[in-house]
């Protein structure tokens, strides 16, 4: 379900402070965050976030087509190792 327009997009306050500092200083350093729930805003284009996926920090470079999505969408938390292979059936026993 979409968020109400009157509420506006959600960004954690500590992440917003880091964004403001980076824009003020014109700094391109990686912004480290655990806040996967923060929405990507237009002012963050060109910045790189290190988003925690539960085990490590995944670097996410913000582009135009990411606006409106959440940071966590670009840092997968699960690794897929593939489905188990079916073992070859044993040769039929002879009578």
Curated annotation (Swiss-Prot):
GO biological process, one term: ribosomal small subunit assembly
PROSITE patterns in the cross-refs: RIBOSOMAL_S19
Signal peptide, first to last residue: none
Claim: RNA-binding is one of the keywords in the record: yes
GO terms, molecular function: rRNA binding; structural constituent of ribosome
Top-level taxon of origin: Bacteria
Record SUPFAM superfamilies: Ribosomal protein S19
Keyword Ribonucleoprotein belongs to the record: yes
Keywords per UniProt: Ribonucleoprotein, Ribosomal protein, RNA-binding, rRNA-binding
UniProt GO cellular component terms: cytoplasm; small ribosomal subunit
Pfam families: Ribosomal_S19
InterPro entries (alphabetical): Ribosomal_uS19 (IPR002222), Ribosomal_uS19_bac-type (IPR005732), Ribosomal_uS19_CS (IPR020934), Ribosomal_uS19_SF (IPR023575)
Family: Belongs to the universal ribosomal protein uS19 family.
Role description: Protein S19 forms a complex with S13 that binds strongly to the 16S ribosomal RNA.
PANTHER family to which the protein is assigned, alphabetical: RIBOSOMAL PROTEIN S19P FAMILY MEMBER, SMALL RIBOSOMAL SUBUNIT PROTEIN US19M
Protein name: Small ribosomal subunit protein uS19
Organism: Bdellovibrio bacteriovorus (strain ATCC 15356 / DSM 50701 / NCIMB 9529 / HD100)
Classification of source organism: Bacteria, Pseudomonadati, Bdellovibrionota, Bdellovibrionia, Bdellovibrionales
Gene name, Swiss-Prot/TrEMBL: rpsS
